[in-house]
Each structure stands twice: as structure tokens, then as C-alpha cells.
Amino acid sequence: WKSEFQSIANKRIQRLESEKALSANPMMPQQVYPELAKALPKGAMVTIDAGVAPGLAYDRVFFEEPRTMFNYAGQGALGMGFSVGLGTKLGRPDRTAVSLHGDGGFLYTCGELNTAVRHNIPSVSIVLNNSCMGAEKSQQKALHNEKYVGVDLENPRFDKLAEVFGAKGYYAEHPSEIADTVAEAVKSNAPAVIEIPVQEYFPPSAPTPR
């Protein structure tokens, strides 16, 4: 079983390496994570919101310490990422706190920017904006012959929205901008939102409705 496990692990590493060759404009969400890894300090706490684009982090962000990955425990709690990200920073103010969101999930709880600013909680929220509800659109593509209902979004610029609340706002349009932008947001020691425009991504196996 050890050799089988090692074979699976090696295939994963090969797949992740192959993703570094992706080139798209707007970028694919897979292109975000190698660049994010360059900016995350050791021991950074990462909260992963529900959704397709942020969910890619499970396979692409390497967590080497306990209590550094936080998620919704499979309960489909869309939008929990922002509030939980703030909580991780309050619990461990000495650690970097980053939360990963799709645009749909972030819209659920972005009003908590008011909380972050009032209490000066320096958590960094990264919004992968593909202008849709990714999981639901994947289901409709797979199960309803691409008949889409209620899944496409018209969003604000989330970096500008953050600035309206008094937080820091950043925009990273190209993969080469991500690492420096994340590092700058962390260094600001202030509540911050980074918008990254990405393409829609439909997983090979669409999420199944329950």
C-alpha cells in the first residue's frame, strides 16, 4: 500500500507542476495557487470558503502545521470564510491570516468589512471573481444541459468595495502580480481585500445536489 500511496502522491505533484504552464487571460483559478504559495509565510492560517474556485486550494496549498487550515467542514456554509478568517486572526494575532473566496461566497458576508475596519482586524481576503456561482453553475451544466438559472452575477469591484468600507483594496489581474500583491496586503497590517479576476472552471465531476 505504501508504493500505491507514493504513486498517487507523485501523480499529484506532476499534475500541480503541469498547471504552472497554464496561460490564460483572464487566468484560470488554478494559476492563483502557485503564486499565492510564494507569498504565504510559514505558519500562515488559511480559511477556505465553500465554492469551486476557493475549493481548489485543498489540493494546491500545502499545510505543514496543525491549525493552519480552516474550512466549512463539508456543510456547504457558503460565505463563512470571511468571518472565520477574522476569527483566526483574533485568535492568533501573531500569525498571518488569509481567507479564500469565490465572488458568490464573499457577497454573502462582505458586510463584515465593517467589523474588520471598526476593530482593525488585519486579515487578508482574496476573492477569485468569475462572476458566477461556480458550484451551482457546474451542477446546471452537468445535469440540465447547460440551462443556467440564477447563477450568473454582476459584481462590484471588490477592491473598490473594500475601500468604501475603509479597508485596503488591491487588484491582481495577472499571475505575476499575485505574490507581490499578497505580500503588500499582509505588510499593510490592515483589513484588506484582493480581487483576482478568473475564468469559470467546471470540475471534471460536478458537485452532486443532495
Explain the meaning of each model-derived region.
Residues 50-54, 130-132, 198-202:
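Glycine-rich beta-alpha junction loops
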Residues 36, 48, 87, 103, ...:
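Hydrophobic, well-ordered secondary-structure elements that form the walls
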Residues 55-133:
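Thiamine diphosphate
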Residues 141-143, 160, 175-210:
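Glycine/aspartate-rich loop-and-adjacent alpha/beta segment that forms the canonical ThDP
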Residues 67-71, 108, 137-150, 167-168:
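Short beta-alpha connecting loops at secondary-structure transitions
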Residues 44-46, 95-97, 123, 190-196:
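Generic beta-sheet signal
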Residues 152-154, 169-174:
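Short acidic-hydrophobic, aromatic-tinged amphipathic segments that line or gate anion-handling sites
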Residues 4-83:
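Active-site diphosphate/adenylate-binding microenvironment
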